[in-house]
Amino acid sequence: MSLHSAGHCTFCLLLFTFYLSCPAQDGDYELAPPPLKFVAKDDKERLESQADLKSRTKLALELMDQRLAEGERLNSSGNFDGLFRELGRFRGLVDYTFGFLGKNDPNNKKVLDNYKRLEISLRSFMSRVEVIHRELPFKYEEYVRGLVKYLRVARTKALDPQFSDTVLPGDKPSD
């Protein structure tokens, strides 16, 4: 009988040991909230002042480049909250540019050229955002990973008007 009691004690001790190790798992990590996605008032005024489609798209791409350059500088100095603010402004500019191009006729060659210009720039921006993503602490990583995915979708969205149902441009052939 004492052997049986010793087995119970050993079992209880073993069960107690495993019970204590279960709560030692990592808790939830605190993630940074996503930044506000907006276009600054002065950026919007500069964009609205451009009447030409090509010059407006080029200006929007320059502003996006400035936001990313400032974000890269803030990232290297360890100011991650400032980086997030710049990434939010960057994404706001991307959305604003797509909204502007979407209001124009997608069959117009000038509009298609600007979509192509936007897609080429988004490709280079995406690689820069991926470099920022590699250097970030875990707290900020989720939003930047989502931004990379968003840029992939945006590139596809910029390419879609280039490929329509017809292969050859021009009028439909007569019967």
Residue ranges and their predicted role:
Residues 1-10:
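Bacterial N-terminal signal peptides that target proteins for export
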Residues 9-21:
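Bacterial N-terminal signal peptides
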Residues 24-175:
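Long, charged/polar, soluble alpha-helical segments
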Residues 2, 22-23:
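N-terminal start-of-domain structural block
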